[in-house]
Curated annotation (Swiss-Prot):
It comes from the Eukaryota. Belongs to the universal ribosomal protein uL5 family. Keywords: Mitochondrion, Ribonucleoprotein, Ribosomal protein. The lineage of its organism: Eukaryota, Viridiplantae, Streptophyta, Embryophyta, Tracheophyta. GO terms for cellular component: cytosolic large ribosomal subunit; mitochondrion. PANTHER family: 60S RIBOSOMAL PROTEIN L11-RELATED. The keyword Ribosomal protein applies. The gene is RPL5. InterPro entries: Ribosomal_uL5 (IPR002132), Ribosomal_uL5_dom_sf (IPR022803). It is found in: Mitochondrion. One of its GO terms (biological process) is translation. One of its GO terms (molecular function) is RNA binding. This is Large ribosomal subunit protein uL5m.
Length: 186
C-alpha cells in the first residue's frame, strides 16, 4: 500500500496503536481498538431525488437501492431516518456504510474538515457521532464540483463505529486521529 494513499492507516499502525497499547495497558496488541465502519446518512427528505446521488459522490461508492422488506426496525434518532408516528423506520435505503478503502478515504476528509470547522461531536462507548453541514462541500473539490446536487441537502449525519469497549478508549482513538491531522497542518 502506498503511504500517501492511506496516511491515517499508517498513522494508526505506526503511532496511534502503539500509544493506545501503552496508555490502556493491554496485554495483547490485538485488543487495541480500531475503526470498524462509518455510517453516513443525508439530512434530507426521502423525496429529494438527488439524495442518493449526493451519497454516492460524498462517499465515493455506488449505492444499491434496497427494497422494502416489510419489516420494521427501531430507529436511531441520530441517523435521521424517515420514521412513522411509532418511531419505526420506513426508509433504510438512505444510509451508506463505508468499510476498508472507502472508509479510509472518507476518514481523511472527515478529519480535515473536523479540525477546520470545529464541529461538535458525541462520543459514546463504541461510536463517534456528529453532523456535517453543507460547508463540508467547500473542503472537498469533488463535492464542490457538484454543488447543484448538494444545495437541497442540509448536510450529513455521520456515525463512526469502533471496536472500543469503553467511552475512554473511543475518545483516545478519535483524539489520536485528530492529532495526526493537526500535526500535518502546523
Amino acid at each position: 500500500m502506498d503511504q500517501l494513499m492511506f496516511p491515517l492507516y499508517f498513522h494508526y499502525e505506526d503511532v496511534l496503536r502503539q500509544d493506545l497499547l501503552l496508555k490502556l495497558n493491554y496485554a495483547n496488541v490485538m485488543e487495541v481498538p480500531g475503526l470498524c465502519k462509518i455510517i453516513v446518512v443525508p439530512k434530507t427528505a426521502p423525496s429529494i431525488k438527488n439524495g442518493k446521488l449526493a451519497m454516492e459522490i460524498s462517499c465515493g461508492q455506488k449505492l444499491k437501492q434496497r427494497a422494502s422488506t416489510g419489516k420494521s426496525f427501531r430507529s436511531n434518532p441520530f441517523l435521521g431516518s424517515n420514521k412513522d408516528k411509532k418511531g419505526y423506520v420506513s426508509d433504510l435505503a438512505r444510509q451508506s456504510t463505508l468499510r476498508g478503502h472507502g472508509m479510509s478515504h472518507f476518514l481523511v476528509r472527515i478529519s480535515t474538515v473536523m479540525s477546520l470547522l470545529d464541529s461538535p461531536l458525541e462520543i459514546r462507548e463504541r461510536s463517534i457521532q456528529f453532523s456535517m453541514e453543507t460547508e463540508f462541500c467547500e473542503f472537498s473539490p469533488e463535492l464542490e464540483d457538484h454543488f447543484e446536487i448538494f444545495e437541497h441537502i442540509r448536510g450529513f449525519n455521520v456515525t463512526i463505529v469502533t471496536s472500543a469497549n469503553t467511552q475512554d478508549e473511543t475518545l483516545l482513538l478519535w483524539s489520536g486521529f485528530l492529532q495526526k491531522d493537526e500535526g500535518e497542518t502546523q
